[in-house]
Amino acid sequence: MHSFYIQLDLFKRHRIRMAPTRKTRRNNRRQNRPSSKIQHHHMLLRLELQRCPTKHDKEKVSRMIQHIIQDINMKSLATPHVYYVEYPKYNEGLTGIAPIETSHIAFHFWTRPDPKILHTAKSNCLLEFDIYTCGSLSQRNVGHVLHHLTQYAPTYADITILNRNTGLTIERHMHWNSEQSQLSWANWLETPAFH
């Protein structure tokens, strides 16, 4: 016992620091980890639609993207940039990007997609849409995005949420097909999957 008190006295007098214990090192590592709010979610959305926006709808689509940004609790860094692409052939359609505080939203509507790549007879338009954020995308956020796209009468949806925090991990995958599902688009959006 006596030697313990002598060592303790030496540490106090000479301000000698003890080597960190295993438990201390573990706690320090935990404190240095990024917050769980940093998830690096990436939503990849492939939608087939009955209706496609035209080149005259650039402003309308820009407003829709601004509403999506608000509804998923993101912060816009600039007005979305929306363009109509005419060339090359079969690439025609609206395309755009919106910078957000945590990264970006990017999309392209193909007004004349190759019918061989479409899944339903009613599909006339193809939309590829992605949101990347170093934040988190909840099921409710995904539902908000899909709700805004309802105006184009979706016929097929393929949605993948990647968590890119430590790799490319598929966190969620959802699929809907108007010709195979017993649920309509509106009813599908009301399921617990989006709440």
Give residue ranges: language-model regions.
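Polybasic/polar functional segments that serve as interface/processing modules
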Residues: 2-195
